[in-house]
Amino acid sequence: MEQPPEDQGPQREPYNEWTLELLEELKHEAVRHFPREWLHGLGQHIYNTYGDTWEGVEAIIRILQQLLFIHFRIGCHHSRIGIIRQRRIRNGSGRS
């Protein structure tokens, strides 16, 4: 039978450390784009729903990722990423 190699490459960070670092990065970025009061309310909702659990940490990460993605996709004023809305100028050139 085939056996997996003994050396699986470099040791990875433990999942919980990586998850907490990701959460801190997302929180730091979210504070730059959303009101603190709104983010605090979101955090309270997650805490009331999940308590102090890893499931709550994963939920807030998922929500912050989705919010930031949509925010950038719509067009953040702090970023070049996103849809650039162009105004149409009516000059009559497109009419026949």
UniProtKB/Swiss-Prot annotation:
Post-translational modification comment from the UniProt entry: Phosphorylated on several residues by host. These phosphorylations regulate VPR activity for the nuclear import of the HIV-1 pre-integration complex.
Alphabetical list of Pfam families matching this protein: VPR
Name this polypeptide is given: Protein Vpr
Organism: Human immunodeficiency virus type 1 group M subtype F2 (isolate MP257)
Localization per Swiss-Prot or TrEMBL: Virion; Host nucleus; Host extracellular space
Residue numbers of Phosphoserine PTMs: 79, 96
Example of a GO biological process term: regulation of DNA-templated transcription
Assembly and interaction partners: Homooligomer, may form homodimer. Interacts with p6-gag region of the Pr55 Gag precursor protein through a (Leu-X-X)4 motif near the C-terminus of the P6gag protein. Interacts with host UNG. May interact with host RAD23A/HHR23A. Interacts with host VPRBP/DCAF1, leading to hijack the CUL4A-RBX1-DDB1-DCAF1/VPRBP complex, mediating ubiquitination of host proteins such as TERT and ZGPAT and arrest of the cell cycle in G2 phase.
Location, primary (coarse class): virion
Renumbered residue ranges of the record's region Homooligomerization: 1-42
